[in-house]
């Protein structure tokens, strides 16, 4: 845990205002929320030494994206003694430059929408949160035990896995070596840097088309590369194909990314073989989809051939007490609004399960 006055000593979040402040042993500490301040005041020594912490909760939620944040709010509304564990609050959605038609918004940015999610979480009174990575989830006699990267162990009768997905890689020469030196998976952080330059976008789905359109508007000379036909929104496809400064290469694959200290080009070739072409570009934005983050729980749950956790209509996984929500599941439609809805459903179902356990009532659960 970072030992800086700019970081909340309870949860590890960076604090940008000084609304909640206290002094302990001559040092001032700032907090992200009234809840974290209250936890600190109960036992300052414990909160300053997170490593090795052990605690038991009614429910532990793993993941800080739309599904996890919504699940946390709905757990709080049920007055469950719950904990949210996440590497960050926001997830992949924070990197989305434009979100269309999320209810209540015609258009909103990822940082703006997920900032509102986070603010709503921090306003809750019954949910604790920590910035930490869950390494493993194991079954124990009375539920589950979760081990974290900071050396903490938490137990609960119910767990919600809302860990989302991570970006798929091309796995071609030069990709890893030139990461952050022209190779990027996060367009929103790199836009202005490449204004007016020649760039390539790899990926023919919504994300790739959105990236190509955004770069085109900045005056970049864009080559959009897709291994098959473009598959995004029809209107967006028409716009990107009509852009004068954009070339679309379908049925092509990247063979290698070139450059020494910085990307200076890439080699592409038609699918199924054919002559390679060299494209002179200064950046490559990779937008080829995601893989589910299931490493921490993979031995426990049933997954489909894509590695997604199989869930029932109440978001239950294959083991009683274990639930999953959002993009990590086999649910149809990888959308922020769907992930948020699944987070709420999973929390409500987990609440029913926990109360049944507490009352000794049998609970039937499992994918259906």
Question: Would you name each region that the model predicts?
Answer:
Residues 114-115, 121-148, 153-156, 216-313, ...:
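A Rossmann-like FAD-binding core segment of flavoenzymes
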Residues 63, 156, 162-163, 169-171, ...:
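Short, well-ordered coil/turn residues at beta-beta hairpins
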Residues 8:
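Short cysteine-rich clusters marking metal-coordination/redox-active sites
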Residues 54-124, 209-234:
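Beta1-alpha1 glycine-rich phosphate/pyrophosphate-binding loop at the start
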Residues 171, 177-193, 286-338, 352:
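FAD-site-proximal beta/loop scaffold in flavoenzymes
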Residues 45-46, 50-56, 165-213, 218, ...:
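Glycine-rich dinucleotide-binding loop and its adjacent helix/turn
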Residues 211, 319, 325-368:
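A conserved FAD-binding loop/helix module that cradles the flavin
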Residues 4, 12, 20-58, 115-116:
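Extreme N-terminal leader/targeting segments of oxidoreductases
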């Amino acid at each position: 845990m970072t030992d800086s006055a700019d970081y909340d000593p309870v949860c590890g979040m960076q604090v940008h205002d000084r609304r909640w402040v206290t002094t302990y042993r001559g040092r001032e500490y700032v907090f992200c929320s009234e809840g974290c301040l209250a936890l600190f005041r109960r036992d300052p020594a414990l909160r300053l030494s997170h490593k090795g912490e052990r605690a038991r909760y009614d429910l532990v939620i793993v993941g800080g994206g739309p599904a996890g944040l919504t699940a946390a709010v709905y757990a709080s509304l049920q007055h469950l003694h719950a904990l949210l564990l996440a590497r960050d609050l926001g997830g992949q959605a924070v990197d989305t430059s434009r979100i269309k038609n999320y209810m209540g918004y015609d258009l909103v940015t990822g940082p703006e929408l997920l900032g509102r999610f986070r603010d709503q979480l921090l306003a809750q009174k019954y949910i604790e949160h920590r910035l930490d990575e869950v390494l493993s989830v194991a079954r124990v006699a009375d539920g589950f035990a979760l081990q974290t990267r900071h050396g903490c162990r938490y137990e609960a009768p119910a767990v919600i896995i809302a860990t989302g997905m991570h970006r798929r890689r091309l796995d071609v020469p030069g990709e890893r070596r030139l990461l952050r030196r022209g190779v990027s998976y996060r367009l929103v952080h790199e836009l202005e840097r490449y204004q007016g330059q020649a760039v390539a976008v790899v990926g023919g789905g919504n994300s790739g088309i959105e990236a190509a359109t955004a770069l085109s508007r900045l005056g970049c000379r864009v080559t959009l590369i897709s291994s098959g036909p473009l598959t995004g929104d029809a209107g967006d496809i028409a716009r990107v194909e009509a852009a004068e400064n954009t070339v679309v290469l379908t049925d092509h694959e990247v063979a290698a990314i070139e450059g020494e200290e910085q990307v200076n080009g890439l080699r592409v070739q038609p699918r199924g073989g054919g002559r390679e072409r060299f494209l002179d570009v200064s950046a490559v934005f990779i937008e080829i989809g995601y893989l589910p983050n299931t490493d921490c729980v993979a031995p426990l749950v049933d997954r489909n051939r894509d590695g997604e956790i199989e869930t029932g209509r109440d978001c239950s996984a294959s083991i009683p007490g274990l639930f999953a929500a959002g993009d990590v599941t086999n649910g149809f439609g990888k959308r922020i609004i769907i992930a948020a809805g699944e987070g709420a459903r999973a929390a409500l179902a987990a609440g029913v399960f926990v109360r049944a356990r507490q009352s000794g009532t049998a609970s039937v659960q499992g994918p259906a």
